[in-house]
């Protein structure tokens, strides 16, 4: 009888729905396991984040979880990395139709991972899939196409848009000058600042236009060999933004 009562009691306890864990508590578990150098435990916690993010369509948490999983899988077994990459590519492709902004953030993360980790994730294939968002012209950059699409541009240039994708998107240096938008993040990932200059000038954000100009010029200076056109461009930019105090 006591055994039966124990079984019933346990069954009742299991039936009680426990409070759902928050993303903060799940990431705290990830952080704790990581600091204890327990990659397998860290992966378990990251998969819990992934599961919750999929259910709630919280793509910043989802992308951060998936790419973090790759880093820890590399410590345990490189063979498992390919499966996670496949899941990333599949999800990014699915989102192209249902949530293009989220899909773009997958692309940004893929490029970042390739740039920083040397991992091949075929971000080029995803990049090509985005061509033609706006009024496509021969040789037009992806950033220019995104800005040409009014619907997409409105979402990417919205103030504090990066908050929609925390903790994936961390506020970068100078992000406040771009009003923490997403288009500057994409441009930074692609090193494609030229389309931003006209956009920020037209929208009245001259500080952002100045920073975009400086970064574009900085990229051009790499390999500089005394190009007179480059010197002239630098002089014109100095004159254009000479009134800015910061």
Residue ranges and their predicted role:
Residues 1-4:
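Positively charged n-region of N-terminal signal peptides that target proteins for export
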Residues 6-17:
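Bacterial N-terminal signal peptides
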Residues 23-246:
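Extracytoplasmic/secretory-pathway proteins
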């Amino acid at each position: 009888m006591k055994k039966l009562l124990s079984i019933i009691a346990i069954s009742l306890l299991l039936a009680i729905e426990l409070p759902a864990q928050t993303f903060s508590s799940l990431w705290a578990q990830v952080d704790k396991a990581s600091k204890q150098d327990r990659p397998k435990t860290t992966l378990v916690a990251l998969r819990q984040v992934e599961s919750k993010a999929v259910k709630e369509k919280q793509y910043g948490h989802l992308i951060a979880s998936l790419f973090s999983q790759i880093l820890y899988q590399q410590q345990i077994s490189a063979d498992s990395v390919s499966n996670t990459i496949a899941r990333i590519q599949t999800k990014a492709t699915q989102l192209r139709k249902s949530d293009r902004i989220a899909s773009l953030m997958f692309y940004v993360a893929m490029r970042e991972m390739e740039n920083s980790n040397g991992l091949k994730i075929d971000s080029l294939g995803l990049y090509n899939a985005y061509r033609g968002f706006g009024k496509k012209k021969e040789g037009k950059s992806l950033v220019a196409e995104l800005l040409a699409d009014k619907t997409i541009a409105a979402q990417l240039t919205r103030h504090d848009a990066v908050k929609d994708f925390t903790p994936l998107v961390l506020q970068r240096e100078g992000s406040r000058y771009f009003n923490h938008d997403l288009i500057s993040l994409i441009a930074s990932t692609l090193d494609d600042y030229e389309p931003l200059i006209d956009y920020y000038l037209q929208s009245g954000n001259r500080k952002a236009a100045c920073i975009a100009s400086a970064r574009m010029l900085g990229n051009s200076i790499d390999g500089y060999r005394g190009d007179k056109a480059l010197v002239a461009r630098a002089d014109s930019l100095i004159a254009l933004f000479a009134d800015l105090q910061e």
